[in-house]
Every structure is written in structure tokens, then in C-alpha cells.
Amino acid sequence: MDFSIKAFNTKNAITQHKSSCIAVGVYEGGKLSHAAKALDLKGALGAALKSGDITGKPGTTLLVHLSSGLAKRILLVGLGAQDNVSDRNFTSAVQAVARVFATLGANDGMLALPLDCVTGRDAHWALRAEVIALRESVFRADGLKSKKDDTANGVRKVTLAVDVADAATKRALAQSVALANGMDLSKTLGNLPPNIC
């Protein structure tokens, strides 16, 4: 899985980013995150909230197909209460995104969850949580199988939305990918039989 970061601000709006699927956050009580509000130009996301199709509870998802715009699909993801998004709720939301991304018939996707919403954590921690959860979802221990699992489907290129794409954020992404690589290697070695490892 390939990761990249993209900063969105007033000059570079999220509505101008072309993607097969953009995952945005929804809070309990029917509140859209900033990215979701920006993408809700025709009111489809707000209507989905009002209809009760998604509650905003952590890990709940709703895929909305769009007929126009640069994004073909918007994935609404529940984050829990807006004033108290815990580590667990955020990780649960990212794992839910990973499950949906694995089933999509698309090659690219974007995570635009609010990185600064997690209580007691910074944006770099949230970035690391996103990378690790997405990489865990695609890990397969099929190195010794005669017929490997078919994993061709699903999102393979993920863009992570950030507020600022400075050197510290790029370093945090590189460290997150390195950590995920180490976790994959540990799992691979742990799954090998004793006569090989």
C-alpha cells in the first residue's frame, strides 16, 4: 500500500481533489467534520445524516455514491462524540475505513479524518494510527501457501489529508510506514514454521 500526504487549506480545497473515494468523519448527534462539510455541496451527506442512515457512533460507515464532482464516493465514518474522541474511537474509525477500502473496486482513496480531534494526542499520532490500521488490513500471511489469496481488489494508493505538509509531517509519515513495515516483518516471521525460522 502506497501512502502520500496532501495539505488542504483555503488555497487548496478538498473539493478540488480527484479521488475514487474520500473518507470523512461524522460525529454523534449528526455533526459533520470540516472536510465533510466542505464536500457536502449538494446536501447529500447532510441528508444521509438526517435520515438516520449513519449515527456517528465509532466505526459505523455509510458509503455515498455521487453522480457529479471529483470524488466518485464519499465514505462517512463515525468518530463518536465530537468533544471526546478517544484513541480507541479513532482507531476503530480508521479500521472501519480500511475494511471498506478493501472491498472497493477502486485503486485510490483518501482519508480526510480530523487528525487533531483525538483527546490527548497530536496529529502525528493520528497519522501513525491511520497508516498502521490500513497496513494491518492488507497484511496476508500466505508466503508458504501454494495458492496465494487474491488481494488484487481494494484501494492500494492512499492519500492522507493533513493541515500542513511540513518536514515534521513528512517525517511522521516515513516513521509510520517504517513502523508498519517492521510490524509486517514481525508477523511474517511469527507465522513461519520452526524449521524455516
Regions found by a protein language model. Give the residues of each.
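Short amphipathic alpha-helical segment within the helicase RecA-like ATPase core
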Residues: 1-197
